[in-house]
Amino acid sequence: MQKHRKFIGDKRFYLMVLGVAMPIMIQNGITNFVSLLDNIMVGQVGTEQMSGVAIVNQLLFIYNLCIFGGVSGAGIFTAQYFGQGNDEGVRNTFRFKLWIGVILTAAAITIFLGAHEPLIRLYLTGDQGSQDMNATLAYGISYMKVMLVGLPPFLFVQLYASTLRECGETMLPMKAGITAVFVNLVFNYILIYGKFGAPQLGVVGAAAATVLSRYVEMAIVLIRTHGNKEKYRFTKHLYRTIRVPAALTKQILIKGTPLMLNETFWAGGVAILMQCYSVRGLNVVAAMNISNTISNLFNVVFIALGDSVAIIVGQLLGAGRMEEAKDTDTKLIAFSVLLCIVIGALMALVAPLFPRLYNTTDEVRHMAAIFIVEVAMFMPVNAFLHASYFTLRSGGKTIITFLFDSVFIWVVSVPVAFCLSRFTGLSIYAIYFMVMSVDLIKCVIGFVLVKKGVWLQNIVAE
């Protein structure tokens, strides 16, 4: 019984964890639920529209994760500075995030404006001149051009929301996010279908609604944060300068560059995996889109608990409470895995139901249901990997997380998917299962690294 105690916390522990995780879970859950409804709305218009939107979102996902990686590199320091009570340290990490975010956003807009067609064509295999392919390409281009207008507000929401969360404030980003997703949902309905006298815009309407919701979310976060400077102390004199001390810049670049590269290469790896699967036909792209949208709804559990590891353990490390950090981390990982066994079983049970909501072929629905079951089987694995990743990251072990995450996907997962999809007669279901199975190797590596305690360090100690 004593041996099991290290994996199980008391009631106060779980209330503390849920206090951090639940707002993130609720925000991401509502966001992903509305994304599901958005996806169904676009799916009701047609398979080509749904596939075009899915391809563009896969490409924009790379930008999203570049921003996430850019702010997370500095965020390691933000959490520990906050734990230390150093407000100026928090301000300087925010300013670093601002610089890196503006550079990445400008680069993304330039690339997507200049090379949108060849990028979308990567996912359109088969007869490039076919009517279905040309329609999917046209819808994708129209959708992307509007979505690029929404990149600046997305950036500013990430800058503020990440800093607020690293300072233990999860409610404000949650409330802003919930408001935004409902704005998105309402205007999706109006603009996609042309309700209440509005023009029927289809995929362009879906993009316009998303962009509008992002500006609403940005306005809420900025106004509420700067309107309460006593509570959010880092906002005092935040823009008095945008200079970042050279010593801190060097520290963040050393610790944070591997993290940013990790997110970028990992997102690129995921995009290439999707391209490998798309070799098996446009139906696979549509089915994967349905599966991924539904999977994201369930994935909010282990994602929120992973974020909780970064926040809770990061603050304990910054305060120098190493033994408490180690004990807390063990309990958090165990809680995440056990909870995701239950969530995965629930997801597998409802797998056949969701694809029926889409206006697509029976083949695509059947394919999507099988993909959902396969993802459900690996949910506990993903929970362990996610918690391990954030454990290592909270202690500044970003080189290790770079090897653990993005190097692995490019050296192992992508070659496996590439070879199986192009040089074997295996079904797409078998290929998908085998590619996910190689993550078990990462589980072993993650277990060893976390158990050894290589992450137990205070990176902001004077």
Ranges and model annotations:
Residues 26, 38-42, 53, 78-83, ...:
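Hydrophobic/aromatic residues within transmembrane alpha-helices of membrane transport systems
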